[in-house]
Amino acid sequence: MDKNDLVQKAKLAEQAERYDDMAAAMKAVTEQGGELSNEERNLLSVAYKNVVGARRSSWRVISSIEQKTEGNEKKQQMAREYREKIEAELQDICKDVLALLDNYLIANATQAESKVFYLKMKGDYYRYLSEVASGDSKKTTVENSQQAYQEAFDISKKDMQPTHPIRLGLALNFSVFYYEILNSPEQACSLAKAAFDEAIAELDTLNEDSYKDSTLIMQLLRDNLTLWTSENQGDEGDAGEGEN
């Protein structure tokens, strides 16, 4: 199918909230090679974020049920098997995205902004894999996630404004990685606070087009900081970290 037709199909699928179809169309666009436009890049990201997000949410629900069925072997086995089925789907989706990133997207990115966007995405999808991994595979996915985030972070600090929504979104997700995956609340808070403070200091550089996106992510950074600080002081907090 022609690239423009595939993009149109992805937009239709998004309107219909059929994200698996949307992801398949944008995967086909990516596999045609060449650099994606900003619109195509965002369509790809939204599609897979919804596809993987549904499985992450399902996995959490079933994991919680599985823990609550201790003592009832039959129910626990059913829950475990269902969790493993969801886990396999989630892993396949992440591996699909990571293959697109490694084989096409990162290599074809010519602008710093695109490179940061895709490296952040790589960090995100290794983070999703690490959420369901254990043992050696967890260690590998965590290392790969941190490496991708760090590379993106270094480029963003060098080549992007502190108020740029992609730089802010990266700081948000990298700080969530420190908090949830590495269990390093101090580092998470330090990273989130620095990103927030740097953006506040340069509010006059806020681009009109991205004003809404940037301020929304700044709000999420601040919400996470409030939550994490209260949790570290021993208050009961809801661990629903905002991420981008």
Curated annotation (Swiss-Prot):
Protein name listed in UniProt: 14-3-3 protein beta/alpha-1
Tissues expressing this chain: Expressed in brain, gill, heart, intestine, kidney, liver, ovary, skin, spleen and testis.
Record PTM N-acetylmethionine, positions in chain: M1
Subunit structure: Homodimer, and heterodimer with other family members.
SMART domains attached to this UniProt entry: 14_3_3
Classification via SUPFAM superfamilies: 14-3-3 protein
Family: Belongs to the 14-3-3 family.
Organism domain of life: Eukaryota
Task of the protein: Adapter protein implicated in the regulation of a large spectrum of both general and specialized signaling pathways. Binds to a large number of partners, usually by recognition of a phosphoserine or phosphothreonine motif. Binding generally results in the modulation of the activity of the binding partner.
Compartments it resides in: Cytoplasm
